[in-house]
Amino acid sequence: MKRDFTLFDIKSTLDYGCGGSDWSLKGFDESSNGSAKEFFRLDKCYRFEPARDLDERQKVDCVLNFDVLEHIFIADISNVINEIFSYAAKLVVINVACYPAGALLPNGENAHITVRSPDWWKAQVDNIALRYPDISVLLITSTGYMVSQAFPIYKANDWLNGNKFITTT
């Protein structure tokens, strides 16, 4: 992602569904003991985590969303993805798990309540990306612990202004 942040000149981020993460904490980069903010050369890092009453949502260069969407009820997925895009000026990075979690909810159900294939998630993100044609997208899907697939970075404008009807990314 460091290369992508440089390529898109990312200076500000919103970690949408950040849990307890803090991009300003030292120790992210083992070689320098620097923070993620320093490692990625960011000016501003904002966080959103409704479970912790943390809401710094605002327009930024890049919105990051890791291990969140699979915890969202299927009927709400498109609204959440749309909101993620609405805060991005340049890039959206989504990582979604496509397998059951190791944890259960208090009612006994799996914590990953929307487990779908990588292609299903790609279709959901593509559908919303069409509403934000100038925003680039990096979608990473995980089919197991430490097993992931990154789709090529794209933006819907490439499809809309292309000379072909078939899209392959």
Features from the language model and the residues they span:
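Conserved alpha-helix/loop element of class I SAM-dependent methyltransferases that forms part
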Residues: M1-I10
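Conserved class I S-adenosyl-L-methionine
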Residues: I10-G20
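Residue-level micro-sites within transmembrane alpha helices that shape
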Residues: L14, L69-E70
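S-adenosyl-L-methionine-dependent methyltransferase catalytic module, highlighting the catalytic core
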Residues: G20-K26, F40-R41, A51-V60, L64-N65, ...
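Conserved S-adenosyl-L-methionine
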Residues: D29-S35, F40-D43
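Conserved SAM-binding motif I beta-strand of class I
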Residues: K44-F48
